[in-house]
UniProtKB/Swiss-Prot annotation:
PANTHER family: IRON-SULFUR CLUSTER CO-CHAPERONE PROTEIN HSCB. Pfam families: HSCB_C. InterPro entries: DnaJ_domain, HscB, HscB_C_sf, HscB_oligo_C, J_dom_sf. One of its GO terms (cellular component) is iron-sulfur cluster transfer complex. This is Co-chaperone protein HscB homolog.
Amino acid sequence: MNYFDLFNVVPAFDIDTALLAERYRELQRAVHPDKFANDTEQQKLLSVQRTAQVNDGYQTLKNPLRRAEHMLSLRGIELSHETTTLKDGAFLMQQMEWREALEDIQHNSDPQSSIDELYESFGEFESTLLTKLATLLISDESADALLAADQIRKLKFMAKLHDELARIEDGLLD
């Protein structure tokens, strides 16, 4: 299903999230199961299914990473359940450096400073990835779609690093 069509928004990486939220509320009102309480069982079931589609579509389009994955899936590139590993040597080296830095945080004399530095480093790297991703998703070239897939894989890894850093930070506050 093309969620951009469902929400009547232009397929793009950068979307108007306020417009998306407005369309979501409109669709929810139109397909809400309560509106079909006195209808046939089939109508009730269709309403529940449609509500689930609207909810999934909204969650997909409001999240930049999921939105990018959806854009690629519309082009036949599925990333949601893949196990492909990245072959970018520089990125793999950077991953190792970040992992070492995460492990060293608890041994630092000023762990919060290290945490702040890592958040800043992650943010700068992610910003670069997102800029590249937005450019690649505009292109109709299949090679660019494959490069966009690699950017998404990197961003997924960065999300895991963020989660790990947040867990470490929470552990220090306990």
